[in-house]
Amino acid sequence: GSVADLDGDGRYEIVLKWEPSNAKDNAHGGYTGNVYIDAYKFDGTFMWRIDLGPNIRAGAHYTQFMVYDLDGDGQAEIVMKTADGTIDGEGNVIGDPNADYRNNNGYVLSGPEYLTVFHGLTGKALATIDYEPPRGNVAAWGDSYGNRVDRFLAGIAYLDGVRPSVIMAR
């Protein structure tokens, strides 16, 4: 989870990642349920939910999200890797709503990957681009089942000394 001022009122809200009970480490095969990112006010009032859909596997290494005021407007944005079938906080679908890239072992080793910035107040997808670096040939990362290609890290850095930049790593 994370905290940030999502609505610009000067108080923190809470952003939580919910994983299903069948989440898997990427060293273990098997289908998983969907991952959800929820926002709440500190009094427990629900704000919005992002459903990452079937093409983001549930497990410790798959979804790293950042919560930070990237544009300096006093409201934090949320940034994370998404895929076809992700549903934003307003019910809008990113990419193909019917796509399911899971293989017979439950891994998602093909299909498009995106990086999406979401509005902190509403959970609405503001911008989506292709995720870099791309997955490419899974075996080129050192194994063929996705243990290395599907490990992600995230951070915020002031690369120019003035503005925050999102750092995503595979």
Report residues per predicted region.
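Beta-propeller-forming repeat regions
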Residues: G1-R170
